[in-house]
Swiss-Prot record:
Species for this entry: Natronomonas pharaonis (strain ATCC 35678 / DSM 2160 / CIP 103997 / JCM 8858 / NBRC 14720 / NCIMB 2260 / Gabara) (Halobacterium pharaonis)
CDD domains tied to this protein: PRTases_typeI
Pathway: Pyrimidine metabolism; UMP biosynthesis via de novo pathway; UMP from orotate: step 1/2
Name of the molecule in the record: Orotate phosphoribosyltransferase
Top class in the EC scheme: transferase
Length: 173
């Protein structure tokens, strides 16, 4: 069931834009969900953190750098839980870490993400966490664009949950 308050907040913040847009995976779309709008709007961010907090349970939180860091940080404050940040690749300086923050081997981790299109960035984050010893079987996104992410994640034994779907967000438009 759609979170109508969140849908209204995303629309009111003008996080959904219409036109011709190139997406990160190379495809194009007639609409764009601008994560930077909803991640920098305190009202949207609060609603997202509340909704994530209702779903994460006792799992350690993880966010994919850079896009999901505000989301995981706000959720961590809401749940009073520590979190980790997963980089796209290992740093070439300092500690050289790909994962920042601590977790125990075998610990259950849930990945929070902004928008899922193909799901590849979430898959990459889950694989990095699994290689580091975490138990990860779930990704929660703000918006599922319904363009194959759910199926792609399922191929990696990862369940995709979304706060809203593109169908929800674009209904009545």
């Amino acid at each position: 069931m759609a979170n109508q308050e969140l849908i209204d907040a995303l629309r009111d913040a003008e996080a959904v834009k219409f036109g011709e847009f190139e997406l990160s995976h190379g495809g194009t779309s007639e609409y764009y969900v601008d994560k930077y709008v909803f991640e920098t709007d305190p009202g949207c961010l609060r609603q997202i953190a509340d909704a994530f907090a209702d779903r994460v349970g006792d799992a350690k939180l993880a966010g994919v750098a850079l896009g999901a860091v505000p989301l995981v940080a706000a959720t961590a404050v809401e749940t009073d839980s520590p979190y980790v940040i997963v980089r796209k690749q290992k740093k070439e300086y300092g500690t050289g870490n790909q994962i920042e923050g601590d977790f125990d081997a075998g610990e259950e981790v849930v990945v929070l993400e902004d928008i899922a299109t193909t799901g590849q960035s979430a898959i990459d984050a889950v694989e990095a966490l699994r290689e580091a010893g975490a138990t990860v079987d779930r990704v929660i996104v703000v918006v599922d664009r319904e363009e194959g992410a759910r199926e792609n994640l399922a191929e990696h034994d990862i369940e995709l949950e979304s706060l809203v779907t593109a169908s929800d967000l674009l209904a009545d438009r």
